[in-house]
Amino acid sequence: MSNMSKGNLKTDKNTDYLFRYFMNEDKLNEQLRTELDREMDEKIKANKNFRLDTRIGTERNKSVTKKPNINGGNVNNANGANNNSSEETELPSNSENSDKPNVDFNDSDSDSSNQDSVTASDGFNGSKSPYKNKINAVPGSILPVNTFGQFPGLNQNFQQDSGQNFNQSPVARNTYTAPQPALGDRLIGDIEKYIETPEEKRARAREAYAKLEELVENYSVQLSRTYTIDDDPNELEAEYQMQKDKRSKKTQVQFYKQILLNIVCGAEYLNETYDPFKIKLKDWSKQMASDMDNYTEVLGEIYEKYRDRGGKMAPEIKLLFMIIMSGVTFHLSQKLFGQGGLSDVVGNNPNVINQLLGGLMKGGMGNMLGGDEPVEAKVTPKNNKSILEAIKKYNNKGTSESKSESRSDYKSESVNSVSTEKSDKQSETIKKITEANEIVAKERERRLMAEQRAEMEAQLRRQSEQHAAEMEQMRNQYLNSIGQLSTTRPVDNYSQPSINDNYVNTPTKINNSVNLVLSDATKKPRFLNNQKVANSPIISNKPLNTRDIGFGDFFGNETDMNKESSKKSGRLNIGGFDNLDSLDSTNSIDSEDDDIVSDINDFFASNKPTKSPKQPVSATKSTTKKRPNSITRSATRSVGRKKGTETSDLITPRKPKIIDL
């Protein structure tokens, strides 16, 4: 501690930097820790009979030194009072009897002994240990600045480097700041404000919906979607705010345009009246009026930039600006068009508006309404002064000005006549063009209908041809099946053994040898030796007489059945084959085929041929009629009706000998 009192405090550069600029209390305690621990160890070694639960007490009359007065005897205490007298500080290292034990172990836990012991161990003026100050610190309090007075060297370094006296600090000492309430505690009182009842929510929805309806009805605003009163009030309010901002921007931009145009008109008028700088600004306002749409984006950006700067404009100020702008506009009209104003000029001379509009159109919009420059624009005077003079002359009803008025009236009448003639010609040409367009439209419609009709006819023709081909195919299949059934003959393939004979029923097939069929090409085929095969109508080229085998009765019955069915359906069926519509149904064909097969099987079972193979099949040729020709003819007749000119190819009778097996 003697080194500390002399100002020989050993600190590194970084620690000095922290002390100098930040007064870091933790760094200071860390720097003093080793010195304080060393002194504490020396005191414990000097006392042999010590107890750990006692406090260290010292006698104030021993090892008392005077604290040096660095600041001229004016040192601040911890309480902020000035002490001119030297204060006695107990330093164990500077005591006279430092070798003897100079501490007493006191069991009392009084505040005075505690304060004395801490003062002796720390070396601070009446303050506790820096460790205890750190632990028992009151919120908001700081380390007393006058503690640096105990270290003259350190205090001098601070004062020399920074030029400030840290013993006189303006910071309040031992201040206490009350803790702030938590966020939840503050919200508990206003919790009802954050809870919205269903009635309040519906009320907000009704209010926002009413505002939206007012915007739509008064200003024809187009909403982003269709809203109802049952929608979310937050969405309704957001939509209303968006539409309101859009409309506010639009109206404000229009107001800016009006202000800009009035400024330009005023500048042009002043330049024409005084002309101090010889600047040619004639018809500048007309050019600005024609190009005003080009300034919409820039004026919108200006509005977006400054709309939140000055806050929302009061409605009174806005109304005042509107009245001022109206007055300025009226003043300009009175100045330009005389005492009567624009209404009197228009009433007395209607062509003034046409002339002004012609001048505007000539500036930048002349080619938008027809391409050619209007006649009124050609008659327009060259400058504004001539317009003012003409208007003043017209307003003055002097005798000398009557001639000029009559001339102007004559010119206006001539201009009106030319314009009426042009309008009549234009109306006639428009009428002719409309009539020609109507004729072209009718002709186009007629051609389109004709093309559609041709396409429909071609489609129907293709469908009819396809249907006829299907019917022809079905007819051929049906005739082939009938021919195959008619040419089938029962063959005695099985020999009937006697009842008494022990005969195994094994079939003895006739003509089952391959050699009987595949004979020599130069000789007559061997299967012709079989009498039954030789007498067949296919081999012998003899017509098949259906009456001999009972087919006539069968086809007669079929004809009667078809007639009865045709009477029920209202159609005529001839010969059992004319009703070709019945061939479209596969179920009817299958049922008829099953009936035919069953009848033929019954016939073969009842009428077995005799054993004499020489008997011809068509024995009763003279007593029967040729049915196949009539059957084929009747079948082709109905198909020929549908195919028209193709009937001649189908009328040829189909002979049984050419039926393909």
From Swiss-Prot:
Query: Per the record, which residues fall in region Disordered?
Result: 55-132, 396-429, 558-577, 604-661
Report biased composition (Low complexity) as residue ranges.
69-84
Q: Where is the composition biased (Polar residues)?
A: 118-130, 607-622
Q: Coiled-coil stretches, from where to where?
A: 23-51, 198-226, 435-485
Q: Which InterPro entries match?
A: DUF5767 (IPR043910)
Residue ranges, compositional bias (Basic and acidic residues): 400-412
Q: Would you say which domain of life the source belongs to?
A: Viruses
Any transmembrane segments, and where?
Answer: none
Q: Which Pfam families match?
A: DUF5767
Q: Which UniProt keywords apply?
A: Coiled coil
**Annotated protein name in UniProt:** Uncharacterized protein R449
